[in-house]
Amino acid sequence: MAEHADTQSLLRLVTWLSPAFPVGSFSYSGGLEQAIHDRLVTGADDLRLWCETLLDHGTTWNDALLLAEGYRACDDAARLIAASELAEALAGSREWHMETMLLGEAFLAAAGHWPHASLEFPGARAAYPVAVGAVAGAHRTGLEAALAAFLNATISNAVSVAIRCGVTGQRDGVGMLARMEKTIGAVATRATRASLDDLGAATIIADIASLRHEILHSRLFRT
């Protein structure tokens, strides 16, 4: 019985965080397109360093903590509202704010195919990591598993952006994902044990890239 529940949770996480899930994540780069344009990321090694820095010290780390808060607060509407508002406040640019809010709205709409009575999400608008955490929490997928799946999907999307911008190929991109498995797992474990008191970022170059992308003339991505 427990094995069946674990398999069901795995299938749900794979589906919810698949590129095929209709949230439109393919259209966002989180400022990576600007970094590529500015030649801050020119190949697979640069891409890995960019992703690892965001995982350890940047927006991806903060998103992990916000997901964990959404997971724990899945049946507490007031706490979910506060978490989502905090996520909005942490968005360092107009485009980052747009990305997290539109992804969150689309995720909640699509996740409606998995309704749950205990999910107390007010309205249909929330920051993306909080929305993912709340839905995963309502369905008891396991917090660390949800974090690992979310972080892996985030890094996978960055690889997809880099491939489409022509700075790495598919083979090198997949190789990077393989090499980052331990890092992703370690960050997921650390985020499970952390709290909102551990929020914080020190990735100023990534923040500036997101801001500069707002005036990038020729672009493939919305952010």
Curated annotation (Swiss-Prot):
For this UniProt record, give its keywords in alphabetical order, as a comma-separated list. Answer: Chaperone, Cytoplasm, Nickel insertion
The compartments listed are: Cytoplasm
Main localization of the protein described in the UniProt heading: cytoplasm
Q: Does the keyword Chaperone apply?
A: yes
Q: Which domain of life is it from?
A: Bacteria
Q: Which InterPro entries match?
A: UreF, UreF_sf
Gene Ontology MF annotations: nickel cation binding
Q: Name one GO cellular component term.
A: cytoplasm
One short Pfam name that applies is UreF
Write out the function statement from the record: Required for maturation of urease via the functional incorporation of the urease nickel metallocenter.
Q: Which PANTHER family match?
A: UREASE ACCESSORY PROTEIN F (PTHR33620:SF1)
UniProt protein name: Urease accessory protein UreF
Native source organism of the sequence: Rhizobium meliloti (strain 1021) (Ensifer meliloti)
Gene name, per UniProt, is ureF
